[in-house]
């Protein structure tokens, strides 16, 4: 990738629309754009940081192609810090492709996927967590996902990491000074104090790592399986959560024989709901296959709703088996059909219990709230700057492991030269999170997941 090239790409999604945008960036962006434009009022130049009305023309034939609005962002006050020109025309794919062709004919290069954002990163306008947030913002499916991505784009992860990283740098500097100036009047940091200072770095990183479980759910969504015996109201509950009649509901046991899936937003978090076949002993081949899929869905889910019939006076043996299995994982016991009567079947199991009526809607709001509590855990939904992808999580994990190695080394009186190796191993991953020292192949992999025009 040559940062001196001028690049072009369509910045709006594929397909027809009212407006389409073609973006040019680089040293020749303004010059090339002017060749394709006939500015209103006879203007000869694009004024920086302004929108201009113009006619789009073929530079060779002079043919008028469209009426457009052109925005010129002069460097360094642009997304990439290069000169950028954005041409907004009518959103015909043919017309947008023609604009790109005209630019390519003047020596401009087609942008690689994510190249505009990669230039913003390489030119120091954003760090790597902010670049990842651009992608997350584009791909967000809920308002809460968009809000989290916007916080990341504003530098929330970097701001949260910076004080911790600075403490580590300061500790390294003190230990280095003790070694470099051992013959001078420089005191060596006692091992006990060094261990305490490592703990001050370790604690916030451990908390950041803890919050990844919630950050991952925000980013990827949560899979929630609804399981239970036949006719306990699983499909009715599913329809209540989906807020429409998505699953077939009848009084006949075994109506649901295959998995029914739907994605809903609960508190801004995408929840992938799975309605399953009622679990029981069955000699029907089709139903047996559905029951096996139910058990697999329960095993694969992030959260399980075990639905039982609260109207039944005594709990069924299979209910207790499902409750016992669910107690070993993240689960909620739903005592349904409370409109017909209430008989608790929880029997003291250590999982949250919510009582509902899928028919009347009673308890459904409480169920949604309990699901969100289970998802949020102790990380807290209000705290900004949490990790949202595996790359960031693994780097924090690597840093924590190196800090623990440094602590162990100090406890057995290993020379500070060896301790410093562990501390540098803890610092490098923190630099990699923001992209301060990330290798080119990793950068190429990250930015290749972006769309062409971003």
From Swiss-Prot:
* Gene that encodes the chain: mnmE
The UniProt subunit note reads as follows: Homodimer. Heterotetramer of two MnmE and two MnmG subunits.
Where in the cell?
A: Cytoplasm
Instruction: State the name under which the record lists this protein.
Output: tRNA modification GTPase MnmE
Enzyme class of the recorded protein, top EC level: hydrolase
**Quick one: signal sequence residues?**
none
Q: Which family does it belong to?
A: Belongs to the TRAFAC class TrmE-Era-EngA-EngB-Septin-like GTPase superfamily. TrmE GTPase family.
Q: What does this protein do?
A: Exhibits a very high intrinsic GTPase hydrolysis rate. Involved in the addition of a carboxymethylaminomethyl (cmnm) group at the wobble position (U34) of certain tRNAs, forming tRNA-cmnm(5)s(2)U34.
């Amino acid at each position: 990738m040559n940062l001196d090239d001028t690049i072009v790409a369509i910045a709006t999604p594929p397909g027809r629309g009212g407006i389409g945008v073609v973006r040019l960036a680089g040293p020749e962006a303004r010059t090339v754009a002017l060749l394709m434009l006939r500015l209103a009022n006879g203007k000869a130049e694009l004024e920086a940081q302004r929108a201009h009305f113009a006619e789009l023309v073929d530079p060779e034939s002079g043919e008028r192609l469209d009426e457009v609005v052109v925005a010129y962002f002069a460097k360094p006050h642009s997304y990439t810090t290069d000169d950028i020109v954005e041409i907004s025309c009518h959103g015909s794919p043919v017309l947008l492709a023609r604009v790109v062709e005209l630019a390519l004919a003047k020596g401009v290069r087609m942008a690689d996927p994510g190249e505009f954002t990669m230039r913003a990163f390489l030119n120091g306008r954003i760090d790597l967590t902010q670049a990842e947030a651009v992608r997350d913002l584009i791909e967000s499916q809920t308002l809460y996902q968009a809000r989290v991505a916007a916080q990341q784009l504003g530098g929330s992860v970097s701001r949260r990491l910076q004080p911790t990283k600075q403490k580590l740098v300061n500790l390294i500097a003190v230990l280095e000074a003790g070694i470099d100036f051992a013959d001078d009047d420089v005191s060596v940091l006692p091992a006990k104090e060094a261990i305490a200072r490592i703990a001050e770095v370790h604690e916030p990183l451990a908390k950041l790592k803890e919050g990844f479980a919630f950050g991952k759910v925000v980013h990827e969504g949560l899979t929630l399986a609804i399981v239970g015996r036949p006719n306990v109201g699983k499909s009715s509950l599913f329809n209540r959560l989906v807020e429409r009649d998505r699953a077939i509901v009848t009084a006949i046991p075994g109506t649901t024989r295959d998995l029914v899936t739907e994605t809903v937003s609960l508190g801004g978090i995408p929840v992938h709901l799975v309605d399953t076949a009622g679990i029981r002993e069955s000699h029907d081949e089709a139903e047996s296959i559905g029951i096996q899929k139910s058990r697999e869905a329960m095993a694969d889910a992030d959260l399980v709703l075990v639905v039982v019939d609260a109207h039944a006076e005594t709990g069924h043996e299979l209910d207790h088996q499902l409750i016992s299995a669910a107690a070993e994982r993240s689960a909620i016991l739903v005592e349904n059909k409370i409109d017909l009567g209430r008989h608790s079947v929880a029997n003291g199991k250590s999982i949250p219990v919510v009582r509902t009526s899928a028919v009347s809607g009673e308890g459904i709001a409480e169920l949604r709230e309990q699901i969100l509590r289970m998802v949020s855990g102790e990380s807290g939904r209000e705290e900004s700057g949490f990790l949202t992808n595996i790359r960031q999580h693994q780097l924090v994990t690597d840093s924590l492991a190196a800090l623990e190695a440094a602590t162990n080394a100090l406890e057995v009186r290993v020379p500070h030269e060896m301790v410093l190796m562990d501390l540098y191993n803890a610092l490098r991953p923190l630099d990699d999170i923001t992209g301060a020292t990330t290798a080119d192949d990793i950068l190429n992999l990250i930015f290749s997941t972006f769309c062409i025009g971003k």
